[in-house]
Curated annotation (Swiss-Prot):
Belongs to the fluoride channel Fluc/FEX (TC 1.A.43) family. The keyword Transmembrane applies. Pfam families: CRCB. Na(+) binds at G72, T75. The gene is fluC1. It catalyses: fluoride(in) = fluoride(out). Its main location: membrane. This is Fluoride-specific ion channel FluC 1. It is a multi-pass membrane protein. Keywords: Cell membrane, Ion channel, Ion transport, Membrane, Metal-binding, Sodium, Transmembrane, Transmembrane helix, Transport. GO terms for biological process: cellular detoxification of fluoride; fluoride transmembrane transport. Fluoride-specific ion channel. Important for reducing fluoride concentration in the cell, thus reducing its toxicity. PANTHER family: FLUORIDE EXPORT PROTEIN 1-RELATED.
Amino acid sequence: MTGAVAPPAVLVAAGGALGAVLRWRVVAATPTTEYPAGTLVVNVVGSFVLAALTFAAADADTMLLFGTGACGAFTTFASFSVDVVALVDADRPVAAAGHALGNLLGAGLAVALAWLLVA
């Protein structure tokens, strides 16, 4: 841990607090509709940020704080899964499939964009 700013657990916890608050703000700011757009936004943006940090070869402390901590708490593939099941339960299979594909393809495209911009 030579040169570390803080113990790894502290960096991850601080980043996690930041990411959780940011996710709450983004989801709260997203217009309420029948489609869970806030989940899509945080997953795509978080995937881009994590990929950019990775491709930029961020140092270990930066990755713990912003990668593992902030991006880990900001993104929410658990809520994404719950959203898909809720859409299926509401007899909206097309919306469920769109949400699933939107999150997965959006995250993948965000990673590709980060690679193009940073690598």
